[in-house]
UniProtKB/Swiss-Prot annotation:
Transmembrane segments: none annotated. Mg(2+) binds at residues 76, 95. One of its GO terms (biological process) is thiamine biosynthetic process. The keyword Chaperone does not apply. HAMAP family: TMP_synthase (MF_00097). It comes from the Bacteria. It comes from Koribacter versatilis (strain Ellin345). 2-[(2R,5Z)-2-carboxy-4-methylthiazol-5(2H)-ylidene]ethyl phosphate binds at residues 140-142, 171. Condenses 4-methyl-5-(beta-hydroxyethyl)thiazole monophosphate (THZ-P) and 2-methyl-4-amino-5-hydroxymethyl pyrimidine pyrophosphate (HMP-PP) to form thiamine monophosphate (TMP). This is Thiamine-phosphate synthase. 4-amino-2-methyl-5-(diphosphooxymethyl)pyrimidine binds at residues 44-48, 75, 114, 143. Belongs to the thiamine-phosphate synthase family.
Amino acid sequence: MASGLKLPRLYAIVDADCFGPEPSLATLTHFAKELVAGGVTLLQYRNKQGSAREILSHARELKRALPPEVTLLLNDRADLAIAAGFHGVHVGQDDLSPEGARLVVGPEMFVGTSTHNPEQLQIADKATVDYLAIGPIFATKSKINPDPVVGLDRLRAVRKLTSKPLVAIGGITRENCRSVIDAGADSVAVIADLLVDPRQRASEFLQILHS
């Protein structure tokens, strides 16, 4: 595993699918810059529909445009994470396995993985990953055919199953994010509730999460 990953309370996701069928690079970059201006220090770039060429082009521009201290993770594509100069990769249950991703990126880059129930989390906990994600905690519209809702009670239960950093994702808003941290998550991943006025929203999230 890589060393030195300290998960911030807010794990912001820049999801290209939220910006229309052909999101412009300028739009994505401006959005990411606004998040960072609001205090975000870690970003995941997610693009489920784009070609490898498009994803790499976008990722490289994000890397160029953002301050070097911002940790950048790429969803799904370990190979493109390396090519873009990102700090790590995040893989899901239907992507390259965590161990496969580790073989691709080596020991120096970060690897995280998504889980949706206690069984998946326990399996992933044995892999050489730097953090685990669990969700959806609440109902979400950011994913087509989402997995069953985990809920706060099950989040509390899975917290006891791992000592690794735990990211909660799915339906998390400014109204409920504090309850997610109180239930045991180290960080909350957010997509939808950052889309409008991202600088202000990020600042509000961080104020709540650190209260």
